[in-house]
Each structure stands twice: as C-alpha cells, then as structure tokens.
C-alpha cells in the first residue's frame, strides 16, 4: 500500500500557507487557493511543512490520507508556478484562434466551436494548431483541456482531431482491397 501521506509537504519560499482546522490556504505570486480536508484527516503546520495524518486507522481514513497530501502539494505548486496543458490540432482546415478570451475552433463542423474558459483559466494560441491552457488549479486546467479535446478527439486512421501534446495516437491500418 502506498504511504505517500507520511511524507510532510514542504512549503516553498515565497508562499504563505495557513491551516485553520481542516482548511489549508496557500497564497503565492500566482494567486490564492484553498483545500478543505476530510473530517477523517488531521492537518497541521509544523516547521514550515504541512503534516497530514489520518484521525483513526480505518480503511476509509487511510484511503483519503495520500490524496489529501497530494491535493495540498498541488495547491502549493499551483500558487507558486501554476499549471499548463498543451494541445495540438491535426487535420486539414482544423485550426484555433482567440476572440477576446474565448477560444474559436474550426474542427470540420458546419459552424466554428466557441469555447468560453472558466474564471481563473487562461488560453493561449501560439500557432493556429497549438493551444496552451494554463491556470493555478491543476484539476481545472486538466478539465478544460479535456473539454477542448472532447470536441474532436483524435481518430485512429489519420490522427485528425485535437490531442494532448504528449499523447501518442495508436494508428490503425485502413481497409485492404
């Protein structure tokens, strides 16, 4: 069984972290985030490190222990450095552009798809075939990237569609005569 929860989360320089009962708040150069731990998890700030422990030894408490520690680590990294996810668009005539803050996608449909990002998320289009989603909340950045990819996921025959930059498409062979 993983024991990732045993390791204390170090608070990086330039970030102020505070623990108020179950609520952990982090303030940094990129913004402010908070995480509310489950009642079965105790959170304490000791020697510039956040220590996470289960209240009792139940299986339910131990299962939430490692996740709570990782969530706290994610908010600390988010307010310090932020997160970004890169997407690539492949296909003839498939492209992306920005209209103000909204992302406009030409993906082979009769009309362009217009995506309005939620608050706290920044979308950049360095090239018409590249999209960069960035923000301080790791979950939200991944969710927005997944929603954009969902409009036209990569297909296995030609690889057309929207894919993550690090994603490898398993290609299929076409019909044989």
From Swiss-Prot:
Look up and give the organism this protein is from: Allorhizobium ampelinum (strain ATCC BAA-846 / DSM 112012 / S4) (Agrobacterium vitis (strain S4))
Which NCBIfam families does the record cross-reference, listed alphabetically? L6_bact
Q: Which UniProt keywords apply?
A: Ribonucleoprotein, Ribosomal protein, RNA-binding, rRNA-binding
Main role? Answer: This protein binds to the 23S rRNA, and is important in its secondary structure. It is located near the subunit interface in the base of the L7/L12 stalk, and near the tRNA binding site of the peptidyltransferase center.
This protein's GO cellular component annotations are: cytosolic large ribosomal subunit
This chain belongs to the protein called Large ribosomal subunit protein uL6
Q: Which GO terms describe its biological process?
A: cytoplasmic translation
Q: Which PANTHER family match?
A: 60S/50S RIBOSOMAL PROTEIN L6/L9, LARGE RIBOSOMAL SUBUNIT PROTEIN UL6M
Q: Which family does it belong to?
A: Belongs to the universal ribosomal protein uL6 family.
Q: Which GO terms describe its molecular function?
A: rRNA binding; structural constituent of ribosome
């Amino acid at each position: 069984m993983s024991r990732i929860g045993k390791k204390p989360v170090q608070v990086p320089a330039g970030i102020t972290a505070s623990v108020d009962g179950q609520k952990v708040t982090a303030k940094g150069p990129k913004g402010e985030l908070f995480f509310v731990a489950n009642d079965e998890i105790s959170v304490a700030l000791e020697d510039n490190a956040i220590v996470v422990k289960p209240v009792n030894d139940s299986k339910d408490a131990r299962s939430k222990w490692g996740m709570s520690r990782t969530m706290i680590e994610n908010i600390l990294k988010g307010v310090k450095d932020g997160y970004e996810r890169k997407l690539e668009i492949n296909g003839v005539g498939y492209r992306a552009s920005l209209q103000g803050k909204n992302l406009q996608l030409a993906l082979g449909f009769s009309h362009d798809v217009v995506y309005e990002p939620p608050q706290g998320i920044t979308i950049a289009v360095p090239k018409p075939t590249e999209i960069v989603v960035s923000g301080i909340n790791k979950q939200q950045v991944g969710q927005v990237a997944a929603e954009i990819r969902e409009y036209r996921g990569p297909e296995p025959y030609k690889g057309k569609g929207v894919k993550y930059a690090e994603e490898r498409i398993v290609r299929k062979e076409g019909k044989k005569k």
